[in-house]
């Protein structure tokens, strides 16, 4: 904790603070930051990052074709160093970019969208403990270098390599705090279920990063119920709120705290049981969609709009046996489930995953760390 003599304590030995400030101002004038200070990078420090991975520094990891811009291993390392990563974090950053490259939306410009989406990373496996990734209390908050800087490394790459500056190529209407950094780890040790990455066929001993494109994180306060159905319906209500229904369907990642996970597991619910329950109950009455002008789809974009709009067309539910019941999810696999957070209160979250039409059965991509 800082004391009244913090200035003396903060002055690192044999460091020229004026030169550090000059370097930070230089990076700011070059627009190589996210608005926060960055770590000055030297060639020798950069080489520590590159030495930790067996990759050609000029290998292209990710391309946004319509911008004609490419991110190489070297550029990824530079931005990881700027973000404050330690060299041992770089294999995670590298795998994150590989996972992002498999996602269809970023390469098509979704990070430039008015919707204000952001990259979101989940890390599983032994690497969590090795580099100090937080999977417990304050999972979406500050205080952990690995979480903060790995997520930030991706965002700085977006800005510095692809030019996604706000008010320029990044046209987000409001954006999200996740645009600074969004990287969490699963609390595998306190989960009653198999870890997220083992659902993809990996061994528990593998370290894996999963990448999503997200729009928001919604709080679920359910501190008193011990009934799995009641708790699941709280998640359902957040998933199918009308404000979330920008397209015909949505997708979500349930980030469940250990206390809530135990409510489900004690009642004999598996992840698939919860997934199927949420899928079946994530519906809206058409009258509810009429009330907010979202009871039809756009011919051009397939976004939700009023049936009175000249560009409107019927949604999929119109051709079913129950045209007045509109599903928010296209398939149970539209719901991903993981356990993270502290085991001290019933406070979970729904992470809203960006979904286009037609929706993907699995709205995420992943890559093994160190592959």
Segments and roles (model prediction):
Residues 2-371:
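Non-transmembrane, aqueous-exposed alpha-helical and coiled segments at domain scale
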């Amino acid at each position: 904790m800082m004391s009244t003599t913090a200035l003396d304590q903060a002055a690192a030995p044999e460091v020229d603070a004026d030169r550090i400030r000059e370097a930070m101002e230089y990076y700011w004038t070059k627009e190589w930051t996210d608005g926060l200070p960055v770590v000055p990078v030297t060639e020798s420090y950069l080489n520590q990052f590159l030495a930790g991975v067996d990759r050609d520094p000029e290998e292209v990891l990710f391309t946004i074709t319509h911008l004609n811009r490419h991110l190489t291993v070297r550029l990824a390392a530079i931005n990881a160093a700027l973000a404050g990563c330690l060299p041992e974090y770089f294999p995670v950053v590298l795998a994150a970019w590989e996972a992002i490259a498999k996602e269809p939306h970023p390469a098509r410009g979704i990070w430039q969208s008015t919707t204000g989406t952001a990259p979101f990373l989940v890390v599983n496996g032994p690497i969590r403990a090795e580099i100090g990734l937080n999977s417990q209390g304050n999972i979406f908050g500050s205080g952990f270098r690995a979480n903060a800087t790995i997520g930030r490394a991706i965002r700085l790459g977006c800005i510095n390599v692809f030019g996604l500056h706000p008010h320029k190529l990044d046209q987000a209407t409001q954006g999200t705090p996740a645009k600074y950094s969004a990287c969490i780890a699963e609390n595998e040790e306190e989960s009653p279920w198999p870890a997220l990455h083992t659902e993809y066929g990996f061994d528990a001993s593998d370290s894996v990063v999963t990448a999503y494109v997200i729009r928001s994180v919604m709080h679920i306060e359910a501190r008193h119920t011990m009934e799995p159905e009641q708790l699941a319906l709280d998640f359902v209500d957040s998933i199918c709120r009308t404000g979330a229904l920008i397209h015909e369907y949505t997708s979500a990642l349930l980030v469940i705290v250990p206390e809530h996970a135990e409510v489900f597991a004690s009642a004999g619910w598996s992840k698939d049981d919860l997934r199927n329950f949420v899928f079946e109950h994530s519906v809206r009455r058409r009258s509810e969609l009429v009330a907010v002008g979202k009871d039809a789809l756009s011919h051009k974009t397939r976004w939700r709009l009023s049936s009175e709009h000249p560009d409107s067309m019927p949604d999929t539910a119109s051709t079913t046996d129950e045209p007045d019941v509109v599903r928010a999810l296209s398939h149970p696999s539209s719901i991903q489930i993981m356990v993270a957070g502290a085991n001290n209160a019933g406070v979970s979250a729904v992470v809203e995953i960006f979904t286009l039409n037609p929706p993907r059965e699995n709205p995420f991509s992943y890559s093994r760390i160190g592959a």
